[in-house]
Amino acid sequence: MKRVLLLLLLLYSSVTYSQSSTGRKAIREITLTGSGYELGLQHGKLLKKEIAEIVAKWKENTKAQLGKDADLVLKEFFQYAHFDDAIKKWTPDLYEEVKGIAAGSGQAFNDIMVLNLLDEFWVYENKLANHHCSGIGVPAMNGNTAYIAQNMDIESYTDGYQILLRLSKTDKRPEQFILTHPGVIALNGMNETGSGACMNTLMQLKASSTGLPVAFIVRQILNSTDKEELLQFIQTVPHASGQNYIIGIRNEVYDFEASANKVVRFDPKNTNGTIYHTNHPLANDDVKEWFAFNTTSSNSHVRLSAVQQRVKDIPTVDDGIIKDALRSKDDKDNPVCRAPKNGGFTFVSVIMTLSGTPNLQVTAGPPDESEYKKIEFTNAR
């Protein structure tokens, strides 16, 4: 019965995709070299026009959402936010990179920094709305391919600004693919050694105004080529925001729920080794006082169920099954795949192949509106 239900779900997803595909353009790709300030300066100069537009749209959106002048909100936010020390301690090159983006684009430093504090600003707002990412992890078991994948859902005003940064290899870092929009150092990504990271906001978990922000954690993960070093980092660094990290390291996948006071691994113990996550904690109990555990009908729970039923009991989960999960709209009010309306949407959908020859498949926008584009690392060409 479960297999019949799954086949029906897959068929429905395929039909929905074929009917709603709008032929979106493939994601824009940009190659950057160097590191630190130099890297940021390239980013800022190359995308100066787009960064100016994003800054203006951020301010317009913030004013509409909060009902007050965005510059005043920014001032109040940075009175709360004290992330500089953690960034300079754990990822000093990335602090310089943000400075370079600001200089290259001609924007104020705080206007660029707040774009890179996406989750931290959401925490400051303390609202659950519009934080709807859905993620999947598949280990390489029984000769199968390892994947991590995600629909990255953020505000609708970012539509049309999807970019893939290709960071060239240096003596200190592997080549990297980074999904983001202009002005931001990372939303998610992977490196050429088969390590990658996908994230889900966990607004319910306790946060810290002095921890290391999510974007900087992501880039540090992608800089790593050592499994033990990477796992040690994610479990010991002080976290600024409640966040779930699906981390792939070649043949293996891990899931960690991070809060201000603890990091807890989530493992559903599935026979096929799969993991999945949306936007509510499943293992970490370091929650804010307002959070209630009995919200089983929430948007996040509905999406988790949709993803889980597609991958949990399948012996071999391939990229086709993952695509069907990420395109799913079982509940029209709580879809995994979100159209650009009502404040938020699926900004990018990404599938990272970790084992064998690592590569990335990505759509610019909701995956039911375009086909995935496969992108390979330089050493695989």
Predicted ranges, named:
Residues 2-3, 150, 166, 219, ...:
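Basic side chains
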Residues 9-10, 157, 310:
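Enrichment for repetitive, rod-forming helical segments
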Residues 1-22:
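Bacterial Sec-dependent N-terminal signal peptides
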Residues 14, 19, 161-162, 168, ...:
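Alpha-helix boundary/interfacial micro-motifs
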Residues 19-127, 131-132, 141, 221-263, ...:
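C-terminus-biased signal that marks the final domain/tail of proteins
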Residues 7-8, 39, 155, 186, ...:
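A broad, structure-centric signal for solvent-exposed, well-ordered loop/edge residues
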Residues 5, 159, 163-165, 169-171, ...:
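Short, basic/low-complexity N-terminal boundary segments at the transition from targeting/disordered tails
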Residues 118-216, 232, 347, 359, ...:
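Internal mixed beta-strand/loop scaffold within catalytic domains of large alpha/beta enzymes
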